[in-house]
Protein backbone atom coordinates (compact mmCIF):
# COMPACT_ATOMS: atom_id res chain seq x y z
CA UNK A 1 0.00 0.00 0.00
CA UNK A 2 2.87 2.36 0.78
CA UNK A 3 4.34 1.90 -2.69
CA UNK A 4 0.90 2.48 -4.25
CA UNK A 5 0.46 5.62 -2.17
CA UNK A 6 3.92 6.84 -3.22
CA UNK A 7 2.99 6.19 -6.86
CA UNK A 8 -0.22 8.18 -6.51
CA UNK A 9 1.58 11.04 -4.76
CA UNK A 10 4.05 11.16 -7.64
CA UNK A 11 1.30 11.72 -10.20
CA UNK A 12 0.87 15.25 -11.47
CA UNK A 13 -2.91 15.05 -11.07
CA UNK A 14 -2.54 14.79 -7.29
CA UNK A 15 -0.79 18.19 -7.25
CA UNK A 16 -2.97 19.99 -9.79
CA UNK A 17 -4.17 23.27 -8.30
CA UNK A 18 -7.14 25.34 -9.39
CA UNK A 19 -4.87 28.01 -10.87
CA UNK A 20 -2.95 25.47 -12.93
CA UNK A 21 -6.20 23.94 -14.18
CA UNK A 22 -7.44 27.36 -15.31
CA UNK A 23 -4.14 28.10 -17.07
CA UNK A 24 -4.24 24.74 -18.83
CA UNK A 25 -7.68 25.73 -20.17
CA UNK A 26 -6.35 29.15 -21.21
CA UNK A 27 -3.47 27.46 -23.03
CA UNK A 28 -5.88 25.09 -24.79
CA UNK A 29 -7.97 28.12 -25.80
CA UNK A 30 -4.89 29.73 -27.37
CA UNK A 31 -4.17 26.52 -29.28
CA UNK A 32 -7.79 26.42 -30.49
CA UNK A 33 -7.63 30.05 -31.64
CA UNK A 34 -4.38 29.35 -33.47
CA UNK A 35 -5.49 26.12 -35.17
CA UNK A 36 -9.25 26.48 -35.67
CA UNK A 37 -9.54 30.26 -36.09
CA UNK A 38 -6.03 30.88 -37.47
CA UNK A 39 -5.52 33.83 -35.07
CA UNK A 40 -1.78 34.66 -35.36
CA UNK A 41 -0.95 30.90 -35.42
CA UNK A 42 2.80 31.41 -35.81
CA UNK A 43 2.97 32.85 -32.28
CA UNK A 44 -0.20 31.74 -30.49
CA UNK A 45 0.47 28.04 -31.19
CA UNK A 46 3.94 27.93 -29.54
CA UNK A 47 2.74 30.32 -26.80
CA UNK A 48 -0.23 28.05 -26.07
CA UNK A 49 1.91 24.92 -26.06
CA UNK A 50 4.47 26.62 -23.85
CA UNK A 51 1.60 27.44 -21.49
CA UNK A 52 0.63 23.76 -21.35
CA UNK A 53 4.19 22.73 -20.51
CA UNK A 54 4.51 25.47 -17.88
CA UNK A 55 1.43 24.36 -15.97
CA UNK A 56 2.05 20.62 -15.74
CA UNK A 57 2.24 19.98 -11.98
CA UNK A 58 5.61 18.95 -10.55
CA UNK A 59 7.32 19.19 -13.98
CA UNK A 60 8.89 22.57 -13.20
CA UNK A 61 9.68 23.28 -16.84
CA UNK A 62 9.18 27.04 -16.47
CA UNK A 63 10.83 27.39 -13.06
CA UNK A 64 14.25 28.87 -12.47
CA UNK A 65 16.56 27.08 -10.03
CA UNK A 66 15.56 29.53 -7.29
CA UNK A 67 11.84 29.08 -7.99
CA UNK A 68 12.32 25.29 -7.82
CA UNK A 69 13.99 25.72 -4.43
CA UNK A 70 11.09 27.82 -3.15
CA UNK A 71 8.57 25.28 -4.47
CA UNK A 72 10.40 22.48 -2.62
CA UNK A 73 9.75 24.14 0.81
CA UNK A 74 12.89 22.81 2.49
CA UNK A 75 13.14 24.71 5.79
CA UNK A 76 16.95 24.60 5.93
CA UNK A 77 17.40 25.87 2.39
CA UNK A 78 14.78 28.59 2.88
CA UNK A 79 16.64 29.72 6.00
CA UNK A 80 19.90 30.08 4.02
CA UNK A 81 18.21 32.18 1.32
CA UNK A 82 16.33 34.27 3.91
CA UNK A 83 19.57 35.00 5.78
CA UNK A 84 21.15 36.34 2.60
CA UNK A 85 18.11 38.56 1.95
CA UNK A 86 17.61 39.62 5.59
CA UNK A 87 13.97 38.50 5.67
CA UNK A 88 11.76 35.91 7.37
CA UNK A 89 12.44 32.28 6.33
CA UNK A 90 9.12 31.70 4.57
CA UNK A 91 8.34 31.59 0.86
CA UNK A 92 6.11 34.68 0.79
CA UNK A 93 8.65 36.88 2.58
CA UNK A 94 11.48 35.64 0.37
CA UNK A 95 9.49 36.38 -2.80
CA UNK A 96 8.75 39.90 -1.57
CA UNK A 97 12.42 40.48 -0.76
CA UNK A 98 13.48 39.18 -4.18
CA UNK A 99 11.02 41.50 -5.93
CA UNK A 100 12.69 44.48 -4.25
CA UNK A 101 16.25 43.20 -4.66
CA UNK A 102 18.73 44.42 -7.26
CA UNK A 103 19.29 42.19 -10.32
CA UNK A 104 22.80 41.37 -9.06
CA UNK A 105 21.33 40.06 -5.78
CA UNK A 106 18.70 38.04 -7.66
CA UNK A 107 21.48 36.46 -9.74
CA UNK A 108 23.41 35.60 -6.57
CA UNK A 109 20.35 33.85 -5.14
CA UNK A 110 19.84 31.95 -8.41
CA UNK A 111 23.48 30.79 -8.35
CA UNK A 112 23.09 29.78 -4.70
CA UNK A 113 20.06 27.64 -5.63
CA UNK A 114 22.13 25.97 -8.38
CA UNK A 115 24.87 25.25 -5.83
CA UNK A 116 22.22 23.55 -3.66
CA UNK A 117 21.46 21.14 -6.51
CA UNK A 118 18.50 22.78 -8.26
CA UNK A 119 18.44 23.30 -12.02
CA UNK A 120 16.31 25.64 -14.14
CA UNK A 121 13.60 24.12 -16.35
CA UNK A 122 14.03 24.05 -20.10
CA UNK A 123 11.44 26.80 -20.70
CA UNK A 124 13.15 28.98 -18.09
CA UNK A 125 16.40 28.53 -20.02
CA UNK A 126 14.64 29.41 -23.28
CA UNK A 127 13.27 32.55 -21.63
CA UNK A 128 16.66 33.60 -20.27
CA UNK A 129 18.37 33.22 -23.65
CA UNK A 130 15.57 34.40 -25.97
CA UNK A 131 13.80 37.16 -24.03
CA UNK A 132 15.85 37.86 -20.92
CA UNK A 133 18.76 38.81 -23.16
CA UNK A 134 16.47 40.62 -25.63
CA UNK A 135 17.91 38.63 -28.55
CA UNK A 136 14.79 36.94 -29.96
CA UNK A 137 12.64 40.07 -30.56
CA UNK A 138 15.66 41.77 -32.16
CA UNK A 139 16.29 38.87 -34.54
CA UNK A 140 12.60 38.84 -35.48
CA UNK A 141 12.79 42.58 -36.15
CA UNK A 142 15.70 41.87 -38.48
CA UNK A 143 13.54 39.36 -40.33
CA UNK A 144 10.63 41.80 -40.53
CA UNK A 145 13.01 44.39 -41.97
CA UNK A 146 14.14 41.91 -44.62
CA UNK A 147 10.49 41.38 -45.62
CA UNK A 148 9.59 45.10 -45.67
CA UNK A 149 9.34 47.29 -48.74
CA UNK A 150 9.81 50.98 -47.95
CA UNK A 151 8.72 51.89 -51.50
CA UNK A 152 5.16 53.07 -50.67
CA UNK A 153 6.47 55.19 -47.77
CA UNK A 154 9.20 56.79 -49.89
CA UNK A 155 6.74 57.40 -52.74
CA UNK A 156 4.41 59.30 -50.40
CA UNK A 157 6.42 60.61 -47.39
CA UNK A 158 3.32 62.25 -45.89
CA UNK A 159 2.17 58.82 -44.79
CA UNK A 160 5.00 58.87 -42.23
CA UNK A 161 2.83 61.31 -40.27
CA UNK A 162 -0.03 58.81 -40.29
CA UNK A 163 2.22 56.16 -38.76
CA UNK A 164 3.41 58.67 -36.17
CA UNK A 165 -0.15 59.69 -35.27
CA UNK A 166 -1.18 56.09 -34.70
CA UNK A 167 1.44 55.84 -31.93
CA UNK A 168 -0.75 58.17 -29.89
CA UNK A 169 -2.55 55.02 -28.76
CA UNK A 170 0.63 53.93 -26.98
CA UNK A 171 1.01 57.04 -24.86
CA UNK A 172 -2.73 57.36 -24.21
CA UNK A 173 -2.71 53.81 -22.85
CA UNK A 174 0.20 54.59 -20.53
CA UNK A 175 -1.87 57.44 -19.10
CA UNK A 176 -4.86 55.08 -18.86
CA UNK A 177 -2.88 52.52 -16.85
CA UNK A 178 -1.57 55.21 -14.52
CA UNK A 179 -5.13 56.54 -14.11
CA UNK A 180 -6.36 53.10 -13.04
CA UNK A 181 -3.55 53.03 -10.50
CA UNK A 182 -4.30 56.58 -9.28
CA UNK A 183 -7.93 55.75 -8.53
CA UNK A 184 -6.95 52.50 -6.84
CA UNK A 185 -8.77 50.29 -9.36
CA UNK A 186 -5.79 48.23 -10.59
CA UNK A 187 -2.22 48.71 -9.36
CA UNK A 188 0.28 49.49 -12.12
CA UNK A 189 3.76 50.95 -11.71
CA UNK A 190 5.16 53.34 -14.33
CA UNK A 191 7.35 50.63 -15.98
CA UNK A 192 4.31 48.32 -16.13
CA UNK A 193 2.16 51.10 -17.63
CA UNK A 194 4.83 51.75 -20.28
CA UNK A 195 5.03 48.04 -21.16
CA UNK A 196 1.23 47.82 -21.45
CA UNK A 197 1.07 50.96 -23.58
CA UNK A 198 3.24 49.46 -26.31
CA UNK A 199 0.36 47.06 -27.10
CA UNK A 200 -1.18 50.06 -28.89
CA UNK A 201 1.60 49.88 -31.46
CA UNK A 202 0.22 46.52 -32.66
CA UNK A 203 3.79 45.23 -32.86
CA UNK A 204 4.32 41.89 -31.13
CA UNK A 205 8.15 41.75 -31.07
CA UNK A 206 8.36 45.33 -29.76
CA UNK A 207 5.79 44.54 -27.04
CA UNK A 208 7.77 41.46 -25.97
CA UNK A 209 11.10 43.33 -26.07
CA UNK A 210 9.84 46.23 -23.96
CA UNK A 211 7.97 43.98 -21.51
CA UNK A 212 11.08 41.87 -21.00
CA UNK A 213 13.00 45.03 -20.08
CA UNK A 214 10.40 46.91 -18.02
CA UNK A 215 7.83 44.42 -16.68
CA UNK A 216 8.81 40.75 -17.17
CA UNK A 217 6.13 39.71 -14.65
CA UNK A 218 3.45 40.94 -17.09
CA UNK A 219 5.07 39.60 -20.25
CA UNK A 220 2.72 36.65 -20.70
CA UNK A 221 -0.45 38.73 -20.48
CA UNK A 222 0.97 41.55 -22.63
CA UNK A 223 2.15 39.17 -25.37
CA UNK A 224 -1.16 37.29 -25.45
CA UNK A 225 -3.10 40.57 -25.58
CA UNK A 226 -0.87 42.02 -28.31
CA UNK A 227 -1.08 39.03 -30.64
CA UNK A 228 -4.75 38.36 -29.95
CA UNK A 229 -5.73 41.94 -30.78
CA UNK A 230 -3.47 41.92 -33.86
CA UNK A 231 -5.47 38.94 -35.08
CA UNK A 232 -8.70 40.85 -34.33
CA UNK A 233 -7.70 43.94 -36.35
CA UNK A 234 -10.32 43.10 -39.05
CA UNK A 235 -13.00 43.25 -36.31
CA UNK A 236 -11.70 46.15 -34.20
CA UNK A 237 -10.81 48.69 -36.88
CA UNK A 238 -13.68 48.87 -39.44
CA UNK A 239 -16.37 50.26 -37.07
CA UNK A 240 -13.99 53.02 -35.94
CA UNK A 241 -12.99 53.81 -39.53
CA UNK A 242 -16.61 54.07 -40.67
CA UNK A 243 -17.60 56.19 -37.67
CA UNK A 244 -14.89 58.77 -38.33
CA UNK A 245 -15.24 59.08 -42.11
CA UNK A 246 -18.02 60.07 -44.48
CA UNK A 247 -19.03 58.07 -47.55
CA UNK A 248 -17.45 60.77 -49.71
CA UNK A 249 -14.13 60.53 -47.85
CA UNK A 250 -14.07 56.75 -48.16
CA UNK A 251 -14.44 57.10 -51.94
CA UNK A 252 -11.38 59.35 -52.35
CA UNK A 253 -9.11 57.95 -55.05
CA UNK A 254 -5.44 58.59 -54.46
CA UNK A 255 -2.96 59.42 -57.21
CA UNK A 256 -0.71 56.67 -58.54
CA UNK A 257 2.45 56.19 -56.49
CA UNK A 258 5.70 57.18 -58.20
CA UNK A 259 8.43 54.64 -58.86
CA UNK A 260 11.07 54.64 -56.14
CA UNK A 261 14.66 54.20 -57.31
CA UNK A 262 16.95 51.46 -56.00
CA UNK A 263 19.35 54.10 -54.67
CA UNK A 264 16.59 55.61 -52.51
CA UNK A 265 15.68 52.21 -51.10
CA UNK A 266 19.32 51.48 -50.21
CA UNK A 267 20.00 54.87 -48.64
CA UNK A 268 16.76 55.09 -46.63
CA UNK A 269 17.46 52.45 -43.92
CA UNK A 270 20.98 53.83 -43.38
CA UNK A 271 19.82 57.46 -43.15
CA UNK A 272 16.85 56.50 -40.95
CA UNK A 273 19.04 54.61 -38.49
CA UNK A 274 21.60 57.40 -38.23
CA UNK A 275 19.00 60.12 -37.76
CA UNK A 276 17.02 58.28 -35.09
CA UNK A 277 19.84 56.49 -33.26
CA UNK A 278 21.96 59.63 -32.92
CA UNK A 279 19.02 61.44 -31.34
CA UNK A 280 17.57 58.49 -29.39
CA UNK A 281 20.21 55.79 -28.75
CA UNK A 282 17.72 53.62 -26.82
CA UNK A 283 15.84 52.99 -30.08
CA UNK A 284 19.01 51.76 -31.81
CA UNK A 285 18.69 48.01 -31.01
CA UNK A 286 15.18 47.56 -32.47
CA UNK A 287 15.52 50.06 -35.30
CA UNK A 288 19.08 48.94 -36.05
CA UNK A 289 18.06 45.31 -36.60
CA UNK A 290 15.05 46.42 -38.65
CA UNK A 291 17.16 48.65 -40.90
CA UNK A 292 19.90 46.03 -41.22
CA UNK A 293 17.39 43.43 -42.40
CA UNK A 294 15.96 45.90 -44.91
CA UNK A 295 19.42 46.85 -46.20
CA UNK A 296 20.21 43.18 -46.85
CA UNK A 297 17.01 42.98 -48.89
CA UNK A 298 17.47 46.15 -50.91
CA UNK A 299 21.22 45.98 -51.54
CA UNK A 300 20.80 42.85 -53.67
CA UNK A 301 24.34 41.67 -52.90
CA UNK A 302 23.57 39.28 -50.02
CA UNK A 303 20.53 37.40 -51.29
CA UNK A 304 21.47 34.24 -49.39
CA UNK A 305 21.62 36.15 -46.10
CA UNK A 306 18.39 38.00 -46.86
CA UNK A 307 16.61 34.75 -47.72
CA UNK A 308 17.90 33.07 -44.54
CA UNK A 309 16.74 35.95 -42.34
CA UNK A 310 13.30 36.08 -44.01
CA UNK A 311 12.68 32.35 -43.72
CA UNK A 312 14.81 29.91 -41.73
CA UNK A 313 16.18 32.22 -39.05
CA UNK A 314 12.96 34.08 -38.25
CA UNK A 315 11.02 30.78 -38.14
CA UNK A 316 13.47 29.16 -35.71
CA UNK A 317 13.54 32.19 -33.42
CA UNK A 318 9.73 32.45 -33.52
CA UNK A 319 9.47 28.92 -32.10
CA UNK A 320 11.72 29.70 -29.13
CA UNK A 321 10.13 33.12 -28.63
CA UNK A 322 6.65 31.60 -28.44
CA UNK A 323 7.69 28.86 -26.01
CA UNK A 324 9.51 31.45 -23.88
CA UNK A 325 6.40 33.62 -23.65
CA UNK A 326 4.42 30.50 -22.75
CA UNK A 327 6.78 30.07 -19.79
CA UNK A 328 5.18 33.19 -18.29
CA UNK A 329 1.63 31.80 -18.56
CA UNK A 330 1.65 30.47 -15.01
CA UNK A 331 -1.18 31.00 -12.56
CA UNK A 332 0.59 33.22 -10.03
CA UNK A 333 1.63 35.67 -12.76
CA UNK A 334 -1.33 35.51 -15.18
CA UNK A 335 -4.37 35.11 -12.91
CA UNK A 336 -4.17 38.61 -11.48
CA UNK A 337 -6.49 41.66 -11.69
CA UNK A 338 -3.74 43.27 -13.75
CA UNK A 339 -4.43 40.83 -16.59
CA UNK A 340 -7.99 42.13 -16.98
CA UNK A 341 -6.61 45.67 -17.01
CA UNK A 342 -4.10 44.73 -19.70
CA UNK A 343 -6.78 43.16 -21.91
CA UNK A 344 -9.05 46.20 -21.49
CA UNK A 345 -6.29 48.75 -22.06
CA UNK A 346 -5.01 46.77 -25.05
CA UNK A 347 -8.23 47.02 -27.03
CA UNK A 348 -8.58 50.70 -26.08
CA UNK A 349 -5.02 51.30 -27.30
CA UNK A 350 -5.84 49.73 -30.66
CA UNK A 351 -8.95 51.87 -30.96
CA UNK A 352 -7.15 55.11 -30.10
CA UNK A 353 -4.28 54.34 -32.48
CA UNK A 354 -6.72 53.61 -35.31
CA UNK A 355 -8.73 56.78 -34.65
CA UNK A 356 -5.60 58.96 -34.39
CA UNK A 357 -4.33 57.74 -37.77
CA UNK A 358 -7.68 58.42 -39.48
CA UNK A 359 -7.99 61.88 -37.91
CA UNK A 360 -4.43 62.80 -38.93
CA UNK A 361 -5.27 61.91 -42.54
CA UNK A 362 -8.32 64.17 -42.37
CA UNK A 363 -6.17 66.96 -40.93
CA UNK A 364 -3.62 66.62 -43.74
CA UNK A 365 -6.43 66.89 -46.28
CA UNK A 366 -7.29 70.37 -44.98
CA UNK A 367 -3.96 71.72 -46.22
CA UNK A 368 -3.22 69.49 -49.20
CA UNK A 369 -4.20 69.51 -52.85
CA UNK A 370 -3.61 65.79 -53.35
CA UNK A 371 -6.14 64.24 -51.00
CA UNK A 372 -5.40 61.24 -48.82
CA UNK A 373 -8.11 58.67 -48.29
CA UNK A 374 -8.54 58.78 -44.48
CA UNK A 375 -9.02 55.02 -44.41
CA UNK A 376 -5.29 54.47 -44.89
CA UNK A 377 -4.67 56.34 -41.62
CA UNK A 378 -5.88 53.30 -39.70
CA UNK A 379 -2.96 51.34 -41.19
CA UNK A 380 -0.62 53.46 -39.07
CA UNK A 381 -0.77 50.76 -36.39
CA UNK A 382 2.04 48.40 -37.26
CA UNK A 383 0.09 45.18 -37.71
CA UNK A 384 1.76 44.41 -41.05
CA UNK A 385 0.13 43.79 -43.48
CA UNK A 386 -3.25 43.13 -41.82
CA UNK A 387 -4.04 46.78 -41.08
CA UNK A 388 -3.27 47.73 -44.70
CA UNK A 389 -5.55 44.96 -45.95
CA UNK A 390 -8.36 46.20 -43.70
CA UNK A 391 -7.98 49.73 -45.12
CA UNK A 392 -8.18 48.31 -48.64
CA UNK A 393 -11.22 46.15 -47.81
CA UNK A 394 -13.22 49.01 -46.26
CA UNK A 395 -12.29 51.24 -49.21
CA UNK A 396 -13.52 48.67 -51.72
CA UNK A 397 -16.88 48.54 -49.93
CA UNK A 398 -17.46 52.21 -50.83
CA UNK A 399 -15.82 52.10 -54.27
CA UNK A 400 -15.10 48.70 -55.86
CA UNK A 401 -12.51 50.35 -58.14
CA UNK A 402 -10.58 52.04 -55.33
CA UNK A 403 -7.57 49.88 -54.47
CA UNK A 404 -5.81 51.32 -51.42
CA UNK A 405 -3.50 48.45 -50.46
CA UNK A 406 -0.22 49.91 -51.74
CA UNK A 407 -1.12 53.37 -50.43
CA UNK A 408 -1.91 51.87 -47.01
CA UNK A 409 1.44 50.06 -46.87
CA UNK A 410 3.13 53.46 -46.44
CA UNK A 411 1.61 54.26 -43.03
CA UNK A 412 1.76 50.56 -42.13
CA UNK A 413 5.55 50.51 -42.51
CA UNK A 414 5.76 53.93 -40.82
CA UNK A 415 3.92 52.38 -37.88
CA UNK A 416 6.68 49.78 -37.45
CA UNK A 417 9.25 52.58 -37.34
CA UNK A 418 7.05 54.58 -34.97
CA UNK A 419 6.57 51.71 -32.51
CA UNK A 420 10.34 51.09 -32.37
CA UNK A 421 10.95 54.78 -31.66
CA UNK A 422 8.17 54.81 -29.03
CA UNK A 423 9.80 51.81 -27.34
CA UNK A 424 13.10 53.71 -27.31
CA UNK A 425 11.41 56.71 -25.69
CA UNK A 426 9.88 54.46 -23.02
CA UNK A 427 13.21 52.80 -22.24
CA UNK A 428 15.07 56.10 -22.04
CA UNK A 429 12.73 57.96 -19.76
CA UNK A 430 11.20 55.16 -17.67
CA UNK A 431 14.50 53.49 -16.80
CA UNK A 432 15.99 56.89 -16.00
CA UNK A 433 13.37 57.50 -13.27
UniProtKB/Swiss-Prot annotation:
Family: Belongs to the GcdB/MmdB/OadB family.
Record has Cell wall biogenesis/degradation as a keyword: no
Organism ancestry: Bacteria, Pseudomonadati, Pseudomonadota, Gammaproteobacteria, Enterobacterales
GO BP: any one term: sodium ion transport
Reactions catalysed according to its record: oxaloacetate + 2 Na(+)(in) + H(+) = pyruvate + 2 Na(+)(out) + CO2
Broad class of the protein's primary localization: membrane
Cofactor(s) demanded: Na(+)
Localization of this protein: Cell membrane
Molecular function via GO: decarboxylation-driven active transmembrane transporter activity; lyase activity
Protein name (database record): Oxaloacetate decarboxylase beta chain 2
Keywords associated with the record: Cell membrane, Ion transport, Membrane, Sodium, Sodium transport, Translocase, Transmembrane, Transmembrane helix, Transport
Transmembrane segments: 16-36, 42-62, 122-142, 168-188, 190-210, 216-236, 266-286, 311-331, 340-360, 413-433
Membrane topology listed for this record: Multi-pass membrane protein
